Amino acid sequence: MHYLAVALPLLTLALAAPSNSVPLTPLNSRQYSEDLAERQSWLLDQAKGLRSKYAPHLGERGQELRRRDIIDEGITRRKRANQKRATGTVSLTDVGLDASYAGQVSIGTPAQDFLVIMDSGSSDLWVAGSTCTENFCKQTYTFDTSTSSSFITSSEAFNITYGSGDADGTLGTDTVSMAGFTVSDQTFGVVTSTSANLISYPLSGLMGLAWKSIASSGATPFWQTLAASGDWDSPEMGVYLKRYRGDNTASQIETDGGQILFGGLNTSLYNGSVNYISIDESEKDYWRIPLEAMVIQGNSVSIASSSGGSNPSCAIDTGTTLIGVPSQTANRIYSQIAGAEALSASSGYEGYYQYPCDTEVTVSLQFGGMSYSISNADMNLGSFTRDTSMCTGAFFAMDMSSRSPVQWIVGASFIKNVYTAFRYNPAAIGFAELVGGSSVSAGNPSSSTTGGGTSGSNGGGSSSGAMERKGVQLGWLVGAVAVGVAAMI
């Protein structure tokens, strides 16, 4: 497997992780539900799980109860198969002032609940296992395979590499549920070791929302199984990422961080129609579409590059904070901002640029014939040098390999400004104006972009190439930049 190397420092997200002596804040659990029926259901599941685990050793009465359990499970499965659950909502938790957006996933029998980063830029599901010895594992929720009666272990190793580090463990299969939907035989990674600071409390892992072709495990992603099954009312996911950057009253962990709707779009969150840009069959790897133009401070900027041609392919990545662009493009972007300068390579922050904090930056990207603005709050990440009059920008210089199918990584700094649709069939990415927003306008035909980008539902992606695994996970890699917690130079 190949990975794109990114020479960036690992900046620690300054979250107050609990010590071993402090109990973790409980996630939603049926055991403590205010609903008596929910609590009773949890209790019955504990008994069923125990009987299942020790079935060969049960006495006569236990065997009889186990047979009843099996009948009940079959009835439940048939009922579920005959029911069409139209949509389901993943309520997002905003961690680190927009550094990561996480949803709750339930794994095993009985279910164990975890917060996992919802990442449209990768395709694997993994969670920290209870045998993990890393410090972060001791301070967050971990999956105990021994207490799940439905877990099937595998001897196959699991490894996934990001720009910020890697995670290692083994593959397993179990029942996985999210937003009211269940996949009974989902393959995922049970992680036993990670690079330092890859993730931290309250996070326990990651849910990949991209296509199967880039899954390190080779498993069909949870979302893709559901979209293909017909269980969804509409084969798409609607994404809204809430902004807490610039909110002085916000905390490091905000439970009202937006939502992902499985099975449709939340029409109450956007105005007008959705502008879909088609994805070719050969491009089902990352969620990627071609960029057609860019305007900053009222001036068109050339987006052409040696690797991406006139219309670079952009991965739309909810698991990333920054907007990664080729270094020559970053140069052009910041040359339009008076007083902007690159942070030196010797400082360890190569790729970042800073500019006067009092500068109001207007910037827009054009996809599918429409221009979408990025708010100044998302463009300006805050001050990270001893010169507090200078602020760091969201566009980050990062040259991808010539074999990479994507040249830009478009993260939450952009996605927060639009309502985003990820459509399974026909494959497409769509954008719409958020309610209360004014981020969308007709594209500018006089843009410096030249060549063959098309618009609307007929838009296509860039040419396909040899696949490379995702090599930058900037959402948590640069958590400190996203939340403004470091003074570095």
UniProtKB/Swiss-Prot annotation:
Activated by the autocatalytic cleavage of the propeptide. Cleaved at the end of the propeptide promiscuously from residue 76 to residue 79. C-terminal cleavage by autocatalysis at Gly-456 at the pH optimum indicating a possible regulatory or other function of this propeptide. Residues 456-489 form a propeptide. Keywords: Aspartyl protease, Disulfide bond, Glycoprotein, Hydrolase, Protease, Secreted, Signal, Virulence, Zymogen. It comes from the Eukaryota. The active site is at 119, 317. InterPro entries: Aspartic_peptidase_A1, Pepsin-like_dom, PEPTIDASE_A1, Peptidase_aspartic_dom_sf. Residues 1-16 form the signal peptide. SUPFAM superfamilies: Acid proteases. Its EC number is 3.4.23.-. Disulfide bonds join 132-137, 357-391. Optimum pH is 3.5-4.5 (determined with 100 mM NaCl). Optimum pH is 5.0 (determined with 40 mM phosphate-borate-acetate Britton-Robinson buffer). Possesses prevalent extracellular endopeptidase activity at low pH condition. Required for high-density growth in acidic environments. Broad substrate specificity with preference cleavage of the peptide substrate between hydrophobic amino acids. Cleaves substrate at P1-P1' between Phe-Leu. Positively charged amino acids are preferred at P2. Prefers hydrophobic amino acids at the P3 and P4 positions. Cleaves substrate also at P1'-P2' between Leu-Val to some degree. Required for virulence in mouse inhalation model of infection. This is Major aspartyl peptidase 1. It comes from Cryptococcus neoformans var. grubii serotype A (strain H99 / ATCC 208821 / CBS 10515 / FGSC 9487) (Filobasidiella neoformans var. grubii).
